[in-house]
Amino acid sequence: MNEQFVRERITQLRLRKGVSEYQMSYALGHSRGYINNITSGKSLPSMNEFFAICEYFGITPAEFFDEHN
C-alpha cells in the first residue's frame, strides 16, 4: 500500500464530500486530530478503520484505490 496515495486519496474524497478533517474525525468516532494525523503522515488507519473510512465515503475498498474514480 502506498502511504502517500492513501493520505492524498482521503484528502481528495474528504474535499469532494465537503467536510473538514475534524468533522470526519468525529463522524468516525475519533478525536479532532485523527484524520489530520493520517493526512499529515503521522499515522495510517488500521484495516478496520480503513473499511470505516470507505463506508463513510460510500465507496468500496476497490473504488478507494481506483485513481480514476
How would you name each of these model-derived features?
Residues 16, 27, 56:
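Residues within the alpha-helical elements of helix-turn-helix
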Residues 24-25, 53:
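Short alpha-helical "recognition helix" segments of helix-turn-helix
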Residues 22, 33, 62:
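Key DNA-contact positions within bacterial/archaeal DNA-binding proteins
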Residues 48-63:
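DNA major-groove recognition helix of helix-turn-helix/homeodomain DNA-binding modules
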Residues 1-17:
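A short, Lys/Arg-rich alpha-helix, primarily the initiator
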Residues 29-45:
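Recognition helix of helix-turn-helix/homeodomain-like DNA-binding domains
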Residues 39, 49, 68:
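DNA major-groove recognition helix of helix-turn-helix
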